[in-house]
Amino acid sequence: VVGSEALAYNVDEGLQIYGGVGFIEEYSIASMYRDERINRIFEGTNEINRLIIGGTVLKKSILEELPIRDLIEMRAVNWLPDLNLLNEEPLKAEARAVEYSRSFTLFCLHESILEYGQDLKNKQWIIEPLSNMVISLSIMDTGYKRYIQIKSGEHKDETRDILKLSIVDQFENCYNNGLDIIKDLFSGEKLADKLSL
């Protein structure tokens, strides 16, 4: 989902740079645009892929193939566990954003299962934003872990700046999708209580 959407975005932006001549076959962007469209047709739509992601997470959670029950209980008490980061850690705020997103995603999954049970798989208006949260969390988490593995001097400063921007973008995406789920699940005082968390 992420790769095909990133490719689609970049090719579309490249086409915009060329303007009307971007569709002329003499320019390489024309074949890129055509190939990208064909890829998306053969791949299937990302909306279906999102339903598959959400359904898989739901199934593995209910069957306890994903050991999240204890994690949900722990995160319900403390959404930001101690990360044991050094004070001079340059990405301390970003690490906290990743963990907050993990807690928020687990919270939304848990509340959705409590509300709908196994019927959640049929609630596409919940499954899609939940899948978006999982995708955003995956991007943030893997990006942060990959950054940690980079040795000093191997473009670490440039990578840090890109990672910061990516985490801000994905955190906002995760948060907004979570709010959509909460607003679908709750109303009135219960909604206000959940939003106060």
Predicted regions and their residues:
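Alpha-helical interface subdomain recognition
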Residues: 1-197
